[in-house]
């Protein structure tokens, strides 16, 4: 048993009313090693136990079984655990080497389904850096979800319906050509889309024409549908190339169009419950009874065309009926917050008790030199261009550091793409951040390549040793390894916390912390010294490679064997 498990077990014995998962999630590292190895804060227990946090901490220390620890002390509102170094080192290394990548797995989810609405680019537009966050956050959350015992279902809710397709069809019919589109489909369609908006600024009647074409598409017009199908097929080809580079797959590509024949059911349900109200010719749901600050949810426009809300309601109902999800996550930018608050409110009014299981996983913006990207204006940074540039930067550094490395191009792709993904996930999900590719692909500092390089370095030590590592000789007495041991020991708690907070940055920051601890040890230790501690040191190195590789996997980043 690793000592975090010992701590959780010991705490749960004196706090039987607190769920084990909640206890595990509260564990943290003290600000100073003088305060112990693991801290348990008691602030949030004050209301439940009706005691001051300091008193709760003191009572826990007086009642807890301390036999598995060096000592347990109360420091203000914290219970601080000082671990038995020898016992903890042995237990941690043996467990990691025995379990391998399964270390940190738990069954909190008991196999329940979690749908994850993610990526969801718009058809007929290239994937830009604006799509990166939803794509990689969703993928990492899916991996973290599975690690916590749930069954993730990744849904790419393609933006393949809406008035923009009416605008695009109008633009193509008015000034586009088939030859142009076939020569360079996505770039040409984007140019048409931007040109439409520029012309519509001068002549507003273009917007009416675009809406009219979309209404024809909704009504099943053959020409409109053929063009839409063509635009969709060309877009999916390019999207698939990007997803393949990021090694991201999906369980469903059911986009907005998939729900065309499923919206009437939702509208009928709203009507049956007398929730639909006519307002200036449109049909809305008044949400003021749930929250007086909420604006009404628009269900149908004055021309009878459906809106995003109608589709999202139909999608939510379909997903519950199809997957019976325990949680339904929507990885969508923070600017859509009100939309999801409205959607959950409508679902509640419809009588669905699972409305609270719908979660908006909001995230902040990526800017380039402080500027937000916009497809309508055309100042868009293409994701494939960023990945290409990241590959080239990674390859340049690899050629400088290790010119004899085999298959440099493959490693450069893993490092370049990994750098872009890691940088995104390293940032707290709801934060905005500016993107600088040169900093992102550096092999030093808080970067993905730094973690990958640390992992490759550790693997190279094991190759040099060229000996099997035994799990029976793990008597480390080197105090320099303690920082690594305690960091390794945190991994199961980190995995749980990342799921509970829906926050992949917890894993990324953990990987950086473990990398720093290992590199400090590497710089000051003779790991391959042939003495009676050699096996134990190699076991430590192997444990580091197991956990770094698994941390990178959870983030959706490759772990090259060599760099």
From Swiss-Prot:
It catalyses: tRNA(Arg) + L-arginine + ATP = L-arginyl-tRNA(Arg) + AMP + diphosphate. GO terms for molecular function: arginine-tRNA ligase activity; ATP binding. Its EC number is 6.1.1.19. Pfam families: Arg_tRNA_synt_N, DALR_1, tRNA-synt_1d. It is an enzyme of class 6 (ligase). Gene3D superfamilies: Arginyl tRNA synthetase N-terminal domain, HUPs, Isoleucyl-tRNA Synthetase, Domain 1. A motif ('HIGH' region) lies at residues 121-131. Keywords: Aminoacyl-tRNA synthetase, ATP-binding, Cytoplasm, Ligase, Nucleotide-binding, Protein biosynthesis. The keyword Nucleotide-binding applies. InterPro entries: Arg-tRNA-ligase, Arg-tRNA-synth_N, Arg-tRNA-synth_N_sf, ArgRS_core, DALR_anticod-bd, Rossmann-like_a/b/a_fold, tRNAsynth_Ia_anticodon-bd. The keyword Aminoacyl-tRNA synthetase applies. Transmembrane segments: none annotated. One of its GO terms (cellular component) is cytoplasm. It is found in: Cytoplasm. GO terms for biological process: arginyl-tRNA aminoacylation. NCBIfam families: argS. This is Arginine--tRNA ligase. It comes from Leuconostoc citreum (strain KM20).
